[in-house]
Regions:
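Short alpha-helical elements
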Residues: 1-280
Length: 280
C-alpha cells in the first residue's frame, strides 16, 4: 500500500500536538453557551493533515476533500491561527533541536542563496521579477547548514537584491547559534550575487569566513583540483526540496503571513525527515 505524503505519522504528530494552542475563553466575558456546547470542533490531527495536504499537492484551500479533512474554510482558519501563534516555526525549531542532538547541526559550512517564484495574486512581499519579464514574483532567501538543513528563511519581493536580504537571513536563524571565537571556524558559502565590500563586511561582522565564489572560479578550482566540489550546491538542493511542496512552486497567497507559514512548515518537514518518519 502506497503511503500518501500528507498522511502524518504517529511519530510526527507526537511532535506537533503539544505545540497546538488550546482554545481559551476570555475571563472577563460572559458567554451564552456552556463550554463544550455547539458544533464539535475538528480533529486537530485531521486539520494538520489537511494543511500538509495543501502544502504537498498545491491545491486551493477550498479544494480540500471535505469527506477526508472536514470544512476547508475551517482548516484555513486554523492554519492562520496556528501561524500567528508560532506553531510552525516552533515545530521547525523543535526539529532542529532533535537534529542537533542526533548528529549535530553542521555549522562549519553554511550556504545562502535566493530563489524566485511567480506570485500573481500576492499583495505583500511582491515585486517585478527581473527574470520573468517584470511579472509579479516573490523571493525566498534561504540559509542552510553543510547538509542542506534549513536554518533561516526570509521572503521578499522578487526585485529585492540578494545582498539586501543577507543580513535579515543571517539574523533570523530559528535556533541559537553557538558562540564563535577566534580563529573563526564557520564559513559562509555564497555565489557572486553576494560579492562586494558591503556583503563581505556584513558576513564578517557576524563572525563568518566569507567564501564567495562565482561559477567561473569554481570551474577553475575543479580543473586545478579534480574531485573538488563546490559547497554552495547544498542550498540549491534545499531550494529544490522546497519546490517539491507544490504550494510553494507558485505563490498564490495574498498575505505574507500565509506565505511565511507555508515556508516555515515546509522547512520543519524537511528537518524532521532527517530525524524521524514523518509520513504514515
Amino acid at each position: 500500500m502506497t503511503i500518501k505524503s500528507w498522511t502524518v505519522s504517529d511519530e510526527l504528530w507526537a511532535k506537533v500536538e503539544p505545540l497546538i494552542p488550546a482554545q481559551k475563553r476570555e475571563q472577563q466575558r460572559e458567554y451564552l453557551r456552556e463550554p463544550g456546547g455547539g458544533r464539535k470542533p475538528l480533529d486537530r490531527r485531521k486539520v494538520f493533515e489537511g494543511i500538509v495536504y495543501v502544502l504537498r499537492t498545491g491545491c486551493q484551500w477550498k479544494a480540500l476533500p471535505e469527506e477526508r479533512f472536514g470544512s476547508a474554510s475551517s482548516i484555513h482558519k486554523y492554519f492562520l491561527a496556528w501561524q500567528r501563534a508560532g506553531v510552525f516555526v516552533q515545530l521547525w525549531r523543535k526539529g532542529l533541536a532533535e537534529y542537533d542532538a542526533m548528529e549535530g547541526i553542521a555549522w562549519a559550512w553554511q550556504s545562502i542563496d535566493g530563489s524566485m517564484v511567480k506570485a500573481p495574486l500576492a499583495q505583500e512581499a511582491v515585486g517585478p521579477n527581473p527574470t520573468d519579464r517584470g511579472k509579479n514574483g516573490s523571493k525566498r532567501s534561504l540559509l542552510v547548514d553543510a547538509n542542506g538543513i534549513p536554518l533561516s528563511i526570509v521572503a521578499s519581493g522578487a526585485n529585492v537584491h540578494d545582498v539586501k536580504l543577507l543580513e535579515p537571513t543571517l539574523d533570523q536563524i530559528v535556533v541559537k547559534r553557538p558562540p564563535v571565537q577566534a580563529p573563526l571556524t564557520e564559513a559562509l558559502c555564497a555565489d557572486n550575487g553576494y560579492a562586494g565590500q558591503p556583503a563581505k563586511q556584513a558576513i564578517e561582522l557576524r563572525n563568518y569566513v566569507p567564501n564567495v565564489r562565482g561559477r567561473r572560479d569554481e570551474n577553475v578550482e575543479k580543473r586545478n583540483e579534480p574531485g573538488k566540489r563546490a559547497r554552495r550546491w547544498v542550498v540549491e538542493r534545499t531550494h529544490s526540496w522546497l519546490n517539491r511542496y507544490r504550494k510553494l512552486l507558485v505563490r498564490f497567497e495574498k498575505k505574507l503571513v500565509s506565505f511565511e507559514g507555508l515556508l516555515e512548515l515546509a522547512c520543519a518537514l524537511i528537518v524532521f525527515r532527517r530525524v524521524t518518519v514523518i509520513y504514515g
